Regions:
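Catalytic cores of carbohydrate-active enzymes across secretory and cytosolic contexts
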Residues: 1-250
């Protein structure tokens, strides 16, 4: 696959703006109704890059008749929005069932709520691969691709296989459980091997970093790099989740 033009590519399941129409029926983009600060924070990152792309999904009735939409955005600075067409069945399976019914309880260490019965792993793989291929098509030679959250766990592996020149980062917007809980997932090795294709994997706190490192070492045989002291701001007296040192790399 040939290189694109974007030096910085974000993969996030939601679009940076909601699509609406003005009184004349013309498409307009409005701020997301969600109160969380993730989307405006990510949007502002485009201020510091010359050419950027945001990849998300859009809902369609029949994806065989639809291609990836591309829009040139200008708020807060110019970037390209790419929207991958997904049908209701794909969205329901990939996001609401596999991600929410399977992954969410495990990530938050509530294994009794884990439900794998309705999961369709093939659909999850297909959606992740479509996000990954869209990123590969948009990214310039040596670009940075930043993948967000567990519903795109497999995207880094697909990206690395297709574009080894890219720098891949991943940020986890949830906790990462202990390896004994994470090991409940039937697809644990595939998920970990994909994340290990990243140059950087980020977590909220050092404990989640250590949980990931232990899972990778125990379940797929990753080699632990040196441990480094944790910054004092992450060490609170009496905090059950604190860690004095953290694994620097695998």
């Amino acid at each position: 696959m040939g290189a694109g033009q974007s030096s910085f590519v974000i993969l996030y399941h939601r679009t940076p703006f909601d699509e609406s129409k003005d009184k004349n029926g013309k498409r307009i983009w409005v701020d997301q109704k969600s109160p969380n600060g993730i989307i405006p924070t990510l949007r502002n990152l485009f201020r510091s890059c010359e050419k950027g792309t945001w990849i998300a999904w859009r809902r369609v009735d029949d994806q065989s008749n639809e291609g990836t939409e591309r829009f040139e955005m200008d708020n807060p600075s110019p970037f390209t929005l790419c929207r991958i067409p997904l049908e209701d069945e794909q969205i329901s399976s990939f996001y609401h069932i596999t991600s929410k019914e399977c992954f969410w309880p495990i990530l938050h260490t509530f294994p009794t709520y884990f439900n794998v019965n309705n999961a369709n792993w093939k659909i999850f793989e297909e959606v992740n691969k479509r996000f990954a291929m869209a990123a590969c098509a948009e990214a310039a030679e040596g670009a940075t691709v930043w993948v967000h959250d567990y519903n795109l766990w497999l995207a880094p592996g697909y990206i690395r296989a297709e574009r080894p020149d890219l720098k891949i980062a991943f940020f986890h917007h949830t906790p990462f459980p202990g390896n004994d809980v994470f090991a409940i997932l039937p697809w644990r090795e595939q998920i970990l091997e994909s994340l290990l294709c990243c140059d950087v994997v980020g977590f909220h706190i050092p404990r989640y970093t250590e949980n990931f490192a232990r899972a990778a070492i125990t379940l797929v045989g990753a080699k632990r790099g040196p441990k480094v002291p944790v910054d004092n701001k992450f060490i609170e007296v009496g905090t059950a989740l604190s860690e004095g040192t953290v694994t620097s790399h695998l």
